[in-house]
């Protein structure tokens, strides 16, 4: 079904038209005109009356004056309501069509409806044939841990026919796996008056279910069906039968769940009120002082009341939803929204039945009306969810509940929503944090609907937003013995009785309370991350669940990474200070602060720590609290947060202590922590440039445009640039664009203007050397300046150069100005990029996780062998910026790992063909401008590149400036989408498994070696390694790193690959890792490109004669051309299979975390013919050969 939903939305998007609409406050819904229309059905055209030809009078004038409306038929009421709803309720026709199309796709097929009716009728006949009897033995396993053997249980035939419950009853079944819930009521005679105590009711319920299941398996009607037991909502006290009918009619797409219930009159009224105790301490062998009141068991009581009140609640829901297509469709919309966010899973899940009851509640409160459209139903529910507080209690009770009683009821639960009977809390098992999360998601949905500049449909209904992608850190505890120890030593008896000794809610309560107190303002929410329990065959024993917990932490970016926890002063609050010391243990110390105060405090780091270290503060706090309070060793816990930060750390092969610099650098540093050093050096250089004396023109603006100035450079930049023989050697250069004051003396000829620009740069270099003692070298790209070990490339921007590039003279001698590739490139680099770079820098100041998220995204794309020529780096930065700008989640991203997961989701689920990614920096685009751009994008989609990204600084180039038809191409875009989906599968499997191990970075940040035809290996000693952490090559094992410094600005491999693509892209695709990759992978184009073709003078590139006047492109000839272009860099060509075979036969595999050991122990591998005669020793390794300067000059 999700696949169908995507398809339907795309179809609606293609057929819809964008229109302006205005939001309307829906608080006045009760004044809307009554109608039975659901708001989506298209109005039927009126039936035209047939007119005889003889009576038809032809019109003499088709252009009558406006006042003549005699022949214009007024719109019908249906049409008027349709138009009003479209104008008032929806963004546009597009949104309405998308919703309508999705609802049509969600409608249950008639064959399923017929099957459900027939199955229920058959099952009703079956239950009538059941007989009373003693259950002495059974070959099935009772799906519950019983305190006594199941002997002597007397089965009583049900006196009430089975009935549908849940979605099947309300007409809101949702695929792709259709689950039909059926209730079978135990007769009152099966229960005794004392069965309310000590799980007796639950055990009888399980036995009753087992007996019915056994009889069904004996029946011929169900002999071929699959029978399994499962726990409803991960609740071990709620076993249900899951039956999968084996029939061609439903083809295993339908499942029946059988619930066993009991009549409400089975026990005395008030027996299960929240303040009563129904599980005695003696049941678990505990002693209890008879003078103390027994603890309440409100959660267990609610568990029993779920069964007892099910019949009455379902009857009321049936009454409210029956024959109301608008309510049903509204609930379907809400269920899709809820499922996409995975808020309805597990013991603490916010189930769809709560939303169904809330719709009825709003209807009773006259907030929602029977005439409301399905869209109004969903919108009103979201709005009321966001703005009402259920912690104080709301009630659906037929007989009104007094406020005092409701408050008394609500005190026993985090969230309180009383059902129709006035006895059961529908939200009994929902923790406060999860309820708050539902409210935040609802509030976000309303905000998205109100945003007229956004098509909110895919964000609300289509995009999957699993809960793990909404959290910043994850805590896993899965050691069975440790959990038992925690529950035994630290779970309070009242909690134990309240949850009937079920471990999971006890763990959830214990950990949530501890972490909430310890993390305080650092954390926004602590959410349980659950997966549905797996069904098991009815012949097997019921599995033990609840001995594993996974919590997601949503952090507050403003406070999460503070290095200090400050406690009360010992003099002012001795008791508070003592409690602070007790809570934090040995971590707490008495400290004096600059304001003179002396208080207890806990210090987790220093203000000078790197951002990566500060992001680990929450981890340190959580692990300390678990160890100090629960005696849980850190080895028994997995705290996931920041594991992927390793990929942009400094390579351990490079030793920082050998670097001559005044900076205090740590060996464990990373690209993020090194960026501020470069920015400070740039700021000082900018001040020196502004302060230069005796320049002919004043420098009016200086802009850093390299990624490092916006914290987006994934490779660590160290102060290691050198001046050697009037040449600057540097691994990276930082680009700076300067603009001068106005002058009318610049030449009007392009080459002369560029010569004058070069002369001006030379003069700036001389002034820098004379006044600031900085070394400089002029190059073809600009002025290279060496400062504090960093190399800056200064470029001079001038408006006249841009105008001269656009200038064209027609045949008639008329001068025109036309955009071309060269002018667009210059305009982007010198005028637009500085503005965008400043905006991205500001974005990083607002969201500290932005820069590091970009680092992860860029490293991932690079390790997938996608360089800037296949996927522009700026496209990555802008897509990540789009994530942080748009409201995809209620809270902003606080951890880069979470940002990276959302980036993968963006790549996986976006409709690149239909979506234009807009970045409205500083809100400088008006709504009308955005609407016009989007309209032009949809109308002329073929004129835009496959990936269209636009910023508010792009002017007339919006959508075409940062990407092109070939970068990324449609094929590359599809390839990246598939890679992102696979990466998400790996991450999700790891995060949601009970295994403590998280994915190793190499699992994500190393490309597959499958699918490539050839691999060209470069000479390792001629290609410098990247300073970033090396995760290995997909083709060859690790080799000795090479950190030699190349000539500044000379990225030879990138230039060679660019030449190969420009010359041979019709015959092959080229892939390499721009971050130090030493292999070039090749994929040949389809064989049709290499077929013989007629001789044509214009199509002879790479061709060889093939006879009969034809020519043909030969792969062997192409390979020789590749070798010629690569020159001295070429080592050899091999297939991936040959490389894999060599690794298996000749080399021991080495993992990335063995790198440090390998440095000390590695020796050159002996070659077959490298042994000295008469000895078994290998010949000494050859010295590294430096590439000759003549070869370098040839590549300039």
Curated annotation (Swiss-Prot):
Basic and acidic residues biased stretches: 22-31, 65-74
Chain positions covered by the region annotation Disordered: 1-74, 1140-1196
GO molecular function per UniProt: RNA binding
Pfam family, any one: Nrap_D2
UniProt GO BP: ribosomal small subunit biogenesis; rRNA processing; tRNA export from nucleus
Cellular compartment(s): Nucleus, Nucleolus; Chromosome
Main location class: nucleus
Keywords: Chromosome, Nucleus, RNA-binding
GO cellular component, one term: condensed nuclear chromosome
Stretch forming the signal peptide: none
Compositional bias annotation for Basic residues: 1165-1187
UniProt keyword Nucleus, yes or no: yes
Subunit structure: Part of the small subunit (SSU) processome, composed of more than 70 proteins and the RNA chaperone small nucleolar RNA (snoRNA) U3.
Family, similarity comment: Belongs to the NRAP family.
Function: Part of the small subunit (SSU) processome, first precursor of the small eukaryotic ribosomal subunit. During the assembly of the SSU processome in the nucleolus, many ribosome biogenesis factors, an RNA chaperone and ribosomal proteins associate with the nascent pre-rRNA and work in concert to generate RNA folding, modifications, rearrangements and cleavage as well as targeted degradation of pre-ribosomal RNA by the RNA exosome.
Name of the protein this chain belongs to: Nucleolar protein 6
Organismal lineage: Eukaryota, Metazoa, Ecdysozoa, Arthropoda, Hexapoda
């Amino acid at each position: 079904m999700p696949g169908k939903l995507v398809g339907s939305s795309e179809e609606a998007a293609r057929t819809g038209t964008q229109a302006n609409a205005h939001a309307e406050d829906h608080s006045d819904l009760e004044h809307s005109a009554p109608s039975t229309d659901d708001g989506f059905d298209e109005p039927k055209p009126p039936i035209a009356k047939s007119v005889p030809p003889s009576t038809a009078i032809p019109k003499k004038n088709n252009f009558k004056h406006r006042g003549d409306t005699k022949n214009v038929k007024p719109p019908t009421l249906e049409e008027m309501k349709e138009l009003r709803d479209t104008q008032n309720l929806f963004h546009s026709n597009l949104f309405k069509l998308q919703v309508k199309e999705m609802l049509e796709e969600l409608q249950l097929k008639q064959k399923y409806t017929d099957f459900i009716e027939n199955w229920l009728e058959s099952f009703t006949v079956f239950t009538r044939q059941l007989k009373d009897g003693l259950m002495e033995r059974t070959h099935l396993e009772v799906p519950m841990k019983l305190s006594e053997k199941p002997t002597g249980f007397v089965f009583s035939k049900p006196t009430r026919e089975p009935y549908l419950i849940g979605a099947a009853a309300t007409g809101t079944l949702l695929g792709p796996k259709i689950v039909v819930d059926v209730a079978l009521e135990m007769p009152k005679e099966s229960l005794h008056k004392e069965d309310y105590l000590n799980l007796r009711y639950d055990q009888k319920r399980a036995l009753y279910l087992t007996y019915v299941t056994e009889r069904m398996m004996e029946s011929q009607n169900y002999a071929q069906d699959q029978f399994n037991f499962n726990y409803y909502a991960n609740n071990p006290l709620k076993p249900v039968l899951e039956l999968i009918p084996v029939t061609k009619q439903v083809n295993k797409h339908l499942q029946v769940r059988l619930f066993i219930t009991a009549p409400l009159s089975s026990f005395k009224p008030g027996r299960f009120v929240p303040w009563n105790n129904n599980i005695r301490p003696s049941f678990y062998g505990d002693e209890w002082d008879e003078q103390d009141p027994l603890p309440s068991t409100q959660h267990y009581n609610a568990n029993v009341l779920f069964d007892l009140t099910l019949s009455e609640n379902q009857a009321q829901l049936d009454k409210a939803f029956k024959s109301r297509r608008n309510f049903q469709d509204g609930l379907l919309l809400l269920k899709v929204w809820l499922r996409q966010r995975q808020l309805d899973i597990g013991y603490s899940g916010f189930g769809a039945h709560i939303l169904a009851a809330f719709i009825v509640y709003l209807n009773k409160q006259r907030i929602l009306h029977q005439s409301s459209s399905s869209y109004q139903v969903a919108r009103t529910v979201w709005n009321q969810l966001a703005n009402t507080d259920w912690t104080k209690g709301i009630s659906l009770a037929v007989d009104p509940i007094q406020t005092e009683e409701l408050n008394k009821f609500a005190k026993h639960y985090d969230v309180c929503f009383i059902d129709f009977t006035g006895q059961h809390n529908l939200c009994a098992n929902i923790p406060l944090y999860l309820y708050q999360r539902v409210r935040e998601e609802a509030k976000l949905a309303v905000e998205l609907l109100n945003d007229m500049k956004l098509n909110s449909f895919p964000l609300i209904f289509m995009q999957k937003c699993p809960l793990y992608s909404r959290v910043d850190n994850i805590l896993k505890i899965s050691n069975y013995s440790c959990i038992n120890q925690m529950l035994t030593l630290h779970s309070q008896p009242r909690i134990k009785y309240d949850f009937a000794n079920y471990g999971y809610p006890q763990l959830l309560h214990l950990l949530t309370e501890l972490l909430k107190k310890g993390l305080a303002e650092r954390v926004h929410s602590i959410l349980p991350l659950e997966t549905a329990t797996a069904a098991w065959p009815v012949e097997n024993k019921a599995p033990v669940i609840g001995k594993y917990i996974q919590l997601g932490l949503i952090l507050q970016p403003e406070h999460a990474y503070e290095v200090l926890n400050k406690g009360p002063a010992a003099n002012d609050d001795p008791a508070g200070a003592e409690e602070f010391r007790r809570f934090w243990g040995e971590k707490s110390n008495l400290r004096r602060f600059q304001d003179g105060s002396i208080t207890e405090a806990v210090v987790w780091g220093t203000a000078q720590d790197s951002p990566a270290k500060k992001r680990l503060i929450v981890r340190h706090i959580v692990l300390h609290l678990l160890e100090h309070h629960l005696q849980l060793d850190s080895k028994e816990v997995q705290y996931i947060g920041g594991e992927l930060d390793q990929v942009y750390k400094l390579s351990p092969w490079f030793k920082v202590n050998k670097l001559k610099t005044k900076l205090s650098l740590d060996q464990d540093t990373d690209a993020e922590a090194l960026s501020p050093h470069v920015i400070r050096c740039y700021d000082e250089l900018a001040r020196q440039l502004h302060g230069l004396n005796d320049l002919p023109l004043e420098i009016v603006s200086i802009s850093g445009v390299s990624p490092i100035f916006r914290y987006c450079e994934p490779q660590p930049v160290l102060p290691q640039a050198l001046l050697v023989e009037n040449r600057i050697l540097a691994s990276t250069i930082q680009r700076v664009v300067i603009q001068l004051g106005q002058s009318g003396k610049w030449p009007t000829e392009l080459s002369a203007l560029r010569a004058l620009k070069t002369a001006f740069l030379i003069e700036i270099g001389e002034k820098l050397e004379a006044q600031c003692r900085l070394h400089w070298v002029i190059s073809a790209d600009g002025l290279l300046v060496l400062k504090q070990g960093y190399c800056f490339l200064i470029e001079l921007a001038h408006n006249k150069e841009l105008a001269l590039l656009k200038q064209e003279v027609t045949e008639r001698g008329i001068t025109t100005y036309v955009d071309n590739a060269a002018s667009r490139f210059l305009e982007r680099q010198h005028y637009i990029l500085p503005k965008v770079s400043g905006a991205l820098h500001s974005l990083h100041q607002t969201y500290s996780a932005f820069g590091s998220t970009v680092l992860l995204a860029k490293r991932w794309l690079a390790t997938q062998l996608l360089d800037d020529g296949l996927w522009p780096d700026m496209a990555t930065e802008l897509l990540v910026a789009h994530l942080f700008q748009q409201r995809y989640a209620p809270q902003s991203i606080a951890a880069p790992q979470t940002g990276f997961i959302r980036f993968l989701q963006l790549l996986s689920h976006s409709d690149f063909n239909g979506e234009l990614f807009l970045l409205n920096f500083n809100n400088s685009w008006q709504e009308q401008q955005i609407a016009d751009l989007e309209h032009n994008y949809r109308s002329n989609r073929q004129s835009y590149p496959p990936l269209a990204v636009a910023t508010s600084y792009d002017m007339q180039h919006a959508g075409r400036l940062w990407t092109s038809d070939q970068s990324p191409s449609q094929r590359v875009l599809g390839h990246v989408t598939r890679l992102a989906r696979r990466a998400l599968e790996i991450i999700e499997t790891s995060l949601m498994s009970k295994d403590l191990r998280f994915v190793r970075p190499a699992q994500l940040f190393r490309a597959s070696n499958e699918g490539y035809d050839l691999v060209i290996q470069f000479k390792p000693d001629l290609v410098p390694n990247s300073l970033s952490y090396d995760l290995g090559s997909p083709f060859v094992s690790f080799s000795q790193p090479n950190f030699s410094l190349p000539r500044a600005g000379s990225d030879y491999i990138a230039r060679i690959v660019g030449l190969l693509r420009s010359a041979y892209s019709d015959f092959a695709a080229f892939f390499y890792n721009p971050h130090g990759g030493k292999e070039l992978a090749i994929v040949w184009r389809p064989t049709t490109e290499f077929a013989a073709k007629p001789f044509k003078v214009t199509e002879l590139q790479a061709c060889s004669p093939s006879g009969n006047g034809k020519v043909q492109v030969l792969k062997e000839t192409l390979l020789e051309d590749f070798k010629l272009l690569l020159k001295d860099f070429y080592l050899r060509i091999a297939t991936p299979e040959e490389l894999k075979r060599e690794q298996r036969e000749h080399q021991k595999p080495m993992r990335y975390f063995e790198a440090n050991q390998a440095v000390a122990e590695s020796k050159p591998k002996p070659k077959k013919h490298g042994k000295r005669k008469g000895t078994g020793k290998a010949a000494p390794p050859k010295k590294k050969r430096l590439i000759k300067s003549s070869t370098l000059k040839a590549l300039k």
